[in-house]
Amino acid sequence: MNVIVFASRKGGTGKSTLAAHLAAHVHKATKPCLLIDADPQGSLTLWHKLRGTNEPAIKSAVNSVSGIVSAAKRDGIEWVFIDTPPNMSAVVEDAIRNATMVIIPARPGVFDVNAVQETILSCRAARKPYAVVLNGAPARRDEVESPIVTIARESLVKFRAPVWGGQITNRADLLMALGHGEGAREYYAEGRAAAEIGRLWAAIERSVKAIRGNASAGGAMHKQAA
């Protein structure tokens, strides 16, 4: 079983958004997923209610996710996506300890980029693989990323933080889909938003495969990233 945790001590970075879109992208009968909403704000739970279906299934966690994760493993769940609150509380630390990989969303601005440091330190302390995902980014122009995205990448290098090479652009389709209780691919499969979510998922899958291979070989898992 693979556990993907979305964590950042800053609010509004896109933890719930990415968790919802990726879960909707991945879930199917042959690849069952579970959502865990550990954020008291309940954004992921709201999205799930708007879906009008119990697929993927969702559980709420207040102080700990460990029991839910253990039960999911017994039930044969393949992927677990955990949304966490914007802090470094006990439930966030517990989620990181249970993670196969931690995704740290950050918008390409000085406040968001600076805020990733505490989450990075927690991942390193727990020896858990992690990667920063630039979310809510300005659209590329002629396939060239915005200068502010480039600056964000350069800043993250100073933290020795692995950063996904792509970006999730600030697109209306992402918000419209959530309002309908859908993921980007369900809302408009041929859209650019769906394509970016698909590329992010492909990167996560590759990383998890590398993490699993490294763990089998006794390698340093906390150095793996998307």
Question: What is each stretch, according to the model?
Answer:
Residues 18:
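Hydrophobic positions on the alpha1 helix immediately C-terminal to the Walker A/P-loop
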Residues 35, 82, 104, 132-134:
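Structural beta-sheet core signal
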